């Protein structure tokens, strides 16, 4: 629920993911009286619509989502692909953003040919590669800072929910930004 006068915080997920990656962070900041908006980009999670093939297009969509949520200004947080989207929002709409946090980012964000081709074929190998490269050695051994959380299993389930073409679209957008 948006409360007028509170600081906004907008979360943008990474490739093939959805808003659920921000559940714990969203709760943390909501308890500190921030207005939380954790988006599902079009064709991700519970969001309808067509895939957006560019980071710039995703950034424009995020601004529309902020408008719909009543967030005139916001702290913006993005993970991986979402960090590029957040960066683009902050660069092109600086009057709307009070702070920027980029998690798991690189600029440029190159994507290997094997990964991109595997994603184009909707091969499970693409999801396996993303999951392998997304976690530390401790994570692969079951280590997690949150008791009872298996991050590799969680990301597996999340990527399995991605619709056809979603991961390829997202990776290609990162590679071309």
Model-predicted segments: where are they?
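Active-site glycine-rich loops that stabilize anionic/oxyanionic intermediates
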Residues: 6, 14-17, 80
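A generic "structured core" feature
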Residues: 12, 76-77, 85-88
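Conserved alpha/beta-hydrolase catalytic His-Asp/Glu region
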Residues: 117-177
